[in-house]
Amino acid sequence: MLRTEEMILNVGPQHPSTHGVFRLILKIDGEIIQEATPVIGYLHRGTEKIAEGLQYTQIIPYTDRMDYLSAMTNNYVLCHAVETMMGIEVPERAEYLRVLAMELGRIASHLVWWGTYLLDLGATSPFLYAFREREMIINLLNELSGARLTFNYMRIGGVKWDAPDGWIDKVKQFVPYMREKLAGYHDLVTGNEIFRERVTGVGRYTKEEAISYSLSGVNLRSTGVKWDLRKDEPYSVYDRFDFDVPVREGGDCLARYECRMAEIEQSLRIIEQACEQFPADGPIMGKLPRIIKAPPGETFVRIEAPRGEIGCYIASDGKKEPYRLKFRRPSFYNLQILPKLLKGENLANVIAILGSIDIVLGEVDG
């Protein structure tokens, strides 16, 4: 008589395809997943609690270390929240530098995802190509901020440094170069029949499920929901740029892949326009009080990060330190749908599905 037994399989917390200290407990029957339980918290550092004992400007370096693949957007959301509370006006030149930094960071983040995702699926070459192009972006951001990963570049009221001489020209030159490479990526991978067969119909969820799980960013837009805060609730100077919001209808790994690749092209469009509109001169810091104290009250702001909506809630009692600081981290919310996606799937699809969601554990754990 044929008999099967359920097996418990641990993926991680030290596993190359979890891209961080993440553990996934799988209950499997043969090759079919019966239940998936994510275990998080290995990288928890208590950022929000630490922030309660710091002045607002001292918190900025901690934001670099949440989503360390898109540190610029983390810098921005905190500064934007404090500026909103205090009514600080940011100079135009500083806003353009912020947008350029964030969009370059968005492309760099998507390149890391693209290279590692294909590596997880068994393709080595795309990983090398992605990091070749990412290195060019990191060098540009290094020239701008003095750092390669944890930039600590943005300041409440502006930015730390002005663009060095010739930096805007280098960014302009990067745009056509990246477009050419992006076309090569599509030839190599996107149109590859083996790749498309591997990810089509895998890890599918509906628009209604995406909304009920509070998914955002690409993970939401891949189900046909056209929602991007840069368009729908413009901040900084995003309302001055002409760009599209890529959406797909499939809600599967392929749809998420195509959305991210299309987003790289839109970021290039924004960068191109920002370089053309870049103010010839002007200050990079607004007028600030000598000591930054947010007035008593609370505020919540949200922006579009590479992994979705990142939000910052501040409750102030009028002191130099926040009474309470809370970040809405998109990776944390996006990860919640993983058990639903994995149930009933083949074991071989675990890494394909996890990689398509694109989480960063520093952001998940906080």
Swiss-Prot record:
SUPFAM superfamilies linked to this entry: HydB/Nqo4-like
UniProt entry tagged with the keyword Transport: yes
EC number(s) reported in the record: 7.1.1.-
Record keywords: Cell membrane, Membrane, NAD, Quinone, Translocase, Transport
Keyword Nucleotidyltransferase: no
Catalyses which reaction(s): a quinone + NADH + 5 H(+)(in) = a quinol + NAD(+) + 4 H(+)(out)
Gene Ontology terms: cellular component: plasma membrane
InterPro entries to which the protein is assigned, alphabetical: NADH_Q_OxRdtase_suD, NDH1_su_D/H, NiFe-Hase_large
Membrane topology: Peripheral membrane protein
Compartment(s) where it occurs, according to its Swiss-Prot or TrEMBL record: Cell membrane
Any one Gene Ontology molecular-function term assigned to this protein's record: quinone binding
Pfam families with a match to the protein in the record: Complex1_49kDa (PF00346)
Family designation: Belongs to the complex I 49 kDa subunit family.
Subunit structure and binding partners: NDH-1 is composed of 14 different subunits. Subunits NuoB, C, D, E, F, and G constitute the peripheral sector of the complex.
Function: NDH-1 shuttles electrons from NADH, via FMN and iron-sulfur (Fe-S) centers, to quinones in the respiratory chain. The immediate electron acceptor for the enzyme in this species is believed to be a menaquinone. Couples the redox reaction to proton translocation (for every two electrons transferred, four hydrogen ions are translocated across the cytoplasmic membrane), and thus conserves the redox energy in a proton gradient.
Name used for this protein in its record: NADH-quinone oxidoreductase subunit D
Organism for this UniProt entry: Geobacillus thermodenitrificans (strain NG80-2)
